[in-house]
Amino acid sequence: MNNSYFYNNFQIEILYEDNDIAILNKPSGLLTHKKNENDDSPNLQDSLNSNFDIEDDEKNKEGIVHRLDKDTSGIIIISKNIISKKLLQEMFKKRELKKNYLAFSYGILNQNQIEINKNIVRNKIKRTQ
């Protein structure tokens, strides 16, 4: 399966979908979820209810299990019910799901490939960095 839908000029690819989860390719420039209740910026969270059959419950929060930064594109897993959300959250908590990040760099590198094995943490002063 390789379908997609459009939301506010963003094309969101559906890489996989079953009764419990959907795996999407979130484009760069799209927030994962609202910053606050008054935020009307385009975000993945708002696009889900009109494109997926998601069990409606405050605990499910429109299926968002993890997030990607606004400027980061990549795979994001959506839970479609509370059971799958709890299982996925537990898997992330236990680090049973491995995340890999690929960065594109401009300029000349001395090597074709490098590996950076460091924790990625939020900038406490500027939350958008």
What do these predicted ranges mean?
Residues 1-129:
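RNA pseudouridine synthases
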